[in-house]
Amino acid sequence: RPPVTEVESQNYYHFHDNRVLPSHVDEALANSEGWWYKPDFIINDLNVQSAIGYPAHEEVVPLVAGTYAVRGYARGHGNKIIRCEVSLDDGKSWRLGSVTHEGQPTEYGKHWGWVWWSLEVPIAELLTTPEIICRAWDSSMNTQPNTFTWNVMGMMNNCCYRVKIHPRQTTDGRFALQFEHPTIAGPTVGGWMNRAEDVAAAAAVTVAPPPAPAGAKSFTMAEVETHTTMESAWFVVDGKVYDATPFLKDHPGGADSILLVAGIDATDEFNAIHSLKAKKQLLEYYIGELAEEGQEAAASDRATPGPAAAIGTAVPVA
């Protein structure tokens, strides 16, 4: 049964998540001036969202006569979506798409379902524009801004969705258009917001795993898998073994968030959601190398080694 209390939750994440702080407020200022605790900035209602589904990311469309059905989805988070629009000239003019509403509003008049929209666009026109842009409007006449406004949590950014268009020549010599979305789902790098040059620049400042020092201990995966408790919690990231045991009690989200990855290779989970700061902090937990498959762990002292000095939080969530 959910508990009923006289005051709002005092959980760490109630105050330090789901907030949209003013754009001049960075993490340091938010901490020093108590911005996290100002009730005006909590997210209760969500804003209008829309996106382009087709053309899909990296889809190639031959340059032929005819039209292409640009399609996507939108949601008003309770408010009815009344129109969806597409622009081929950076928002100078807009074309009205057809909107399909599935399902009925609730007894309270709320529209919680996604809607689907589409617009037939001449393929020849797609050749003359660098991108396709979409936006939606709800029944309160709210729409999406042209560009996003930075905030420290990166939340509620619902600016117009943009798909870039690149002329290409196919392997058989025909001309075509290839489409590029701003990003792609999951931890994989892709999309026009993560171009190769940006990735290379980011790689230059990425925290590299610590090199294996001479005589470093090595551990088999089977050994790591035995350390899954409050008394001993190990995990693997990028072939390195880390021990977060002393920090379980200090983690603001509780020990469970670390114990979920204890005893496993947490590379994907860790790298997908953690910041550069968190990756620097991770180095303090390093205790040895993961032995390659078929390789015996070092036969040296097997006493559980302790990590370096405490740094304030267990595997930090950023």
From Swiss-Prot:
Its cofactor is FAD; heme; Mo-molybdopterin. Its EC number is 1.7.1.1. Residues 216-291 form the Cytochrome b5 heme-binding domain. Coiled coil: none annotated. Binds 1 FAD per subunit. GO terms for molecular function: heme binding; molybdenum ion binding; molybdopterin cofactor binding; nitrate reductase (NADH) activity; sulfite oxidase activity. Heme binds at residues 251, 274. InterPro entries: Cyt_B5-like_heme/steroid-bd, Cyt_B5-like_heme/steroid_sf, Cyt_B5_heme-BS, Ig_E-set, MoCF_OxRdtse_dimer, Mopterin_OxRdtase_euk. SMART domains: Cyt-b5 (SM01117). Keywords: FAD, Flavoprotein, Heme, Iron, Metal-binding, Molybdenum, NAD, Nitrate assimilation, Oxidoreductase. Belongs to the nitrate reductase family. Homodimer. Nitrate reductase is a key enzyme involved in the first step of nitrate assimilation in plants, fungi and bacteria. This is Nitrate reductase [NADH].
